[in-house]
Amino acid sequence: MSAAFAGPFIERNIHKASLIACLCFTAGMAGTGLCIRYSTMLGTGLTTARIFLFYGCIMGIGLGIGYLTPVKTLMLWFKDNPGLGTGISIMGFGLAKAIASPVMNTLQGRIGLANMFFVLTGVYFLMMMLGHFLLKKPEGWVEPQVKNTVNRLKLFRNKTYAGIWLMFYINITCGLALISYEKPILQLAGFGMAAISVVQSLTAASNALGRIGFSTFSDHLKDRNSVYKTIFLLCIGTAAAAFAVSAVSKGILAVVFILLLVVNAGYGGGFSTLPALLSSRFGMKNISSIHGVALSAWAFAGLSGNQLTALILRMTGSYENVIIVLAGLYLIAFLIAQFVVGTEEQELCVPSGAASAE
């Protein structure tokens, strides 16, 4: 949620934002390590509360600000291909998981959980500070002199913006509903542990490639919303096919594998294409603010995605029912993309003087 509120600050000073992102992220990580190290002394309740503070709040603030900071800058550097720019930025966010997860597992096994956090604090601090010093806008770029403001609540009165937020929310909810249960789905389908590790590496790669692939593809389309329609149709088709043949319960490995690849690619592509789609509808003015508010859908989807799967499994005990529900949600998202999201550029920002006069 920090991304939803930090947008105006990032617009004003991108360098200060990147520094705060670095300090909050690494301070939260170091604090988490300390909580784990002294958990016996602190007690379970106090340790849990402090981990929530450091890992959930402080580190989360750094994560949200750090996610937004490079997006507009890269869109300015790639002004003729903004989808490629956002794809590079957001692919880095997704690819980091594929790289960091095995490193974290190795460190935890060799030096323990608390020391893992301390080592990663140093590594991330160096990398994020390097990014902070290298970050700059293109030579000759001048921000517009007229300051604009965005009323976060009024954003959702705009049909196009509300439609974009909702279809993004559905895409992330569906993605998390499947991705968070990837391992048990693969186990039930009959994959061995070695094969599961390989498949999860490939789905992570599909997620990363979807981020740069779909957003770059949007640069070559008349309407960037067509990317979302493509994602939803692909997910509907593969989910319907997997349901029709009972791929999970009958162990049809190829169909399960393709379904996970497609959903992961669409999940990643939904993230990376979002800022380019928003800029095509509402311009570059305050894009960090507008994009940040749209990312609140990610926060809500994080609460609903895996819970949706858990609810369906508790009620029916079948992954096939999960898959067909997701196909229905993807269909709703496609209809929103087709009939609710407008095609024309609109004005969401108003001059600050006008805003204060209200």
Which stretches of residues belong to each language-model region?
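Hydrophobic core of transmembrane alpha-helices in multi-pass small-molecule transporters
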Residues: 28, 44-65, 169, 254-269
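Intracellular juxtamembrane helix-capping segments at the cytosolic ends
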Residues: 65-78, 85-86, 269-282
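Extracytoplasmic gate region of multi-pass secondary transporters
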Residues: 101, 158-216, 271, 275, ...
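Helix-to-loop junctions at the C-terminal end of transmembrane segments
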Residues: 2-14, 211-225
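A late C-terminal transmembrane helix in Major Facilitator Superfamily
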Residues: 97, 281-316
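C-terminal ends and interior cores of transmembrane alpha-helices
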Residues: 24-44, 237-250
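C-terminal transmembrane helical hairpin of 12-TM major facilitator-type secondary transporters
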Residues: 204, 222-277
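Helix-loop-helix hairpin linking two adjacent transmembrane segments in secondary transporters
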Residues: 93-136
